[in-house]
């Protein structure tokens, strides 16, 4: 394994001022669970692989997720986040995958000028990834690029909470890093806005660290985290969950002194007269995650406005040939195990494309098959957004609101092609639904250009 830790300046450039160029079959951007899974799968397929990671260590967000609950699907045992990550780190370090740590990607160039170079396998290198390191710049050329940059948290400015701007307002993930990695206590008395999984987990973590959690406040009339986290993190510790309630003002000059909370109506607007003040010195925000796709957009990748991730086909290839996406940069997942499974698919497809075997893994589109996939009913999104091959496909989706009885239906030209069983759905759970090859072929035979995944509530008898 070649490790280039740019913090220590281990990478050497040639002549002074020259930009060193290295060639790979697959360049993976991101060294978290998605990036490592994609890289390992591509390496096993025979591709020469590089991982670029802006942090000093591999592992991504899992390094600070010291709670259990990882690995139940992939390893059939319960692990903490660092334990789960370390299993992949050990596998990566046992290979010759090149690691570029402490390196920031500046851009991905897919221009024609790159096409003259050759990848390690002998095929034309279609992309150049430019890195900024401490002492130099590097360029990595590759036939394929896998985007695995993960996601970031929404901040106070993005949800526009009124009030003063004192110290003591953190995103939940930042507070998690302070406590679990930096050994810093963010405050003594906390209010948590948002019932996403990280907010629920931090309610428990703060309690264990001696921080009094006054309550978790959720804008929606239901919890946005997994049910097991509501039970394990709130119910078991006696932490109250206030639904249909939000923070409407931050109070304090130098440090947070209190927050004002208000109940909201069915339109999510604060109800006048329901305001009350909750004394605290810390406000943690768990108000959503955003796929980190600035590099993707600059490279010409089309984004889905519903997921804010890339539009991909069954092989997880974006609209830019040779660029694939996986993990939370594609759509936000509930479980790291699911990230791993999806990213292994992306790594296999990227390697097949780079090594010239794309047709065997649907990495090369069938020109006779081009269908878009759209959500309907209470489905918030459907992924992949494109069908480019007649093959069994797994569609991922989330619903916009919880429902006790609903059915998934696949439609084409207004005709029902396939339907699932009636069951319950929750927004906190990413769902999957099979799309058989025969259904895709039938849609094509009907002359359809779109397949619709509709989740429709069913009235109980």
Stretches found by the model and what they are:
Residues 9-19, 151-191, 195-200, 306-314:
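Glycine-rich dinucleotide-binding loop and its adjacent helix/turn
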Residues 1-25, 432:
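Extreme N-terminal leader/targeting segments of oxidoreductases
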Residues 359-403:
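Surface beta-strand/loop "capping" patches
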Residues 24-87, 91, 95, 186-230:
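Beta1-alpha1 glycine-rich phosphate/pyrophosphate-binding loop at the start
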Residues 14, 147, 169-179, 282-333:
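FAD-site-proximal beta/loop scaffold in flavoenzymes
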Residues 6, 86-131, 207-294, 391-424:
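A Rossmann-like FAD-binding core segment of flavoenzymes
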Residues 22-24, 135-144, 271-281:
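Core beta-strand elements of the Rossmann-like FAD/NAD(P) dinucleotide-binding domain
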Residues 326-373:
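A conserved FAD-binding loop/helix module that cradles the flavin
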């Amino acid at each position: 394994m070649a490790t280039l830790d740019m913090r220590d300046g281990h990478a050497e450039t040639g002549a002074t001022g020259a930009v060193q160029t290295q060639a790979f079959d697959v360049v993976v951007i991101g060294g978290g669970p998605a990036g490592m899974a994609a890289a390992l799968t591509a390496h096993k397929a025979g591709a020469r692989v590089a991982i670029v990671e802006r942090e000093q260590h591999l592992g991504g967000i899992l390094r600070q997720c010291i709670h259990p609950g990882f690995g139940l699907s992939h390893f059939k045992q319960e692990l903490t986040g660092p334990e789960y990550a370390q299993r992949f780190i050990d596998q990566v370090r046992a290979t010759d995958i090149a690691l570029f740590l402490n390196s920031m990607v500046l851009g991905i160039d897919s221009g024609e000028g790159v096409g003259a170079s050759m990848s390690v396998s002998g095929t034309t290198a279609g992309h150049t990834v430019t890195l900024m390191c401490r002492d130099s710049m590097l360029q990595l050329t590759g036939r394929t690029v896998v985007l695995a940059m993960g996601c970031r948290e929404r901040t106070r400015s993005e949800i526009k909470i009124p009030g003063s701007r004192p110290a003591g307002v953190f995103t939940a993930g930042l507070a998690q890093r302070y406590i679990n990695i930096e050994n810093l206590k963010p405050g003594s008395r906390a209010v948590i806005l948002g019932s996403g999984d990280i907010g629920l987990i931090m309610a428990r973590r703060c309690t264990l660290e001696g921080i009094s959690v006054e309550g978790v406040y959720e804008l929606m009339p239901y919890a946005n985290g997994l049910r097991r986290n509501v039970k394990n993190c709130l119910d078991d510790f006696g932490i109250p969950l206030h639904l249909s309630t939000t923070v409407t003002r931050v109070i304090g000059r130098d440090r947070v002194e209190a927050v004002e909370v208000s109940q909201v109506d069915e339109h999510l607007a604060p109800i006048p007269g329901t305001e009350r003040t909750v004394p605290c010195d810390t406000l943690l925000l768990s108000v959503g995650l955003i796929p980190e796709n600035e590099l993707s957009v600059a490279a010409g990748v089309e984004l889905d406005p519903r997921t804010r991730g890339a539009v991909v086909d069954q092989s997880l290839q974006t609209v830019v040939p040779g660029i694939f996406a996986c993990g939370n940069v594609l759509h936000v997942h509930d479980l790291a195990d699911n990230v791993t499974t999806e990213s292994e698919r992306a790594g296999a497809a990227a390697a097949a494309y780079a090594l010239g075997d794309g047709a065997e893994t649907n990495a090369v589109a069938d020109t006779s098959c081009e269908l878009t996939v759209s959500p309907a009913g209470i489905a918030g999104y459907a992924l992949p957004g494109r069908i480019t091959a007649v093959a069994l496909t797994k569609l991922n989706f989330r619903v916009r609101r919880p429902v006790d009885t609903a059915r998934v239906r696949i439609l084409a030209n207004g005709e029902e092609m396939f339907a699932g069983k009636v069951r319950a759905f929750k927004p906190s759970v990413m769902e999957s639904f099979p799309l058989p090859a025969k259904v895709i072929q039938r849609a094509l035979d009907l002359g359809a250009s779109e397949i619709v995944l509709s989740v429709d509530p069913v009235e109980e008898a």
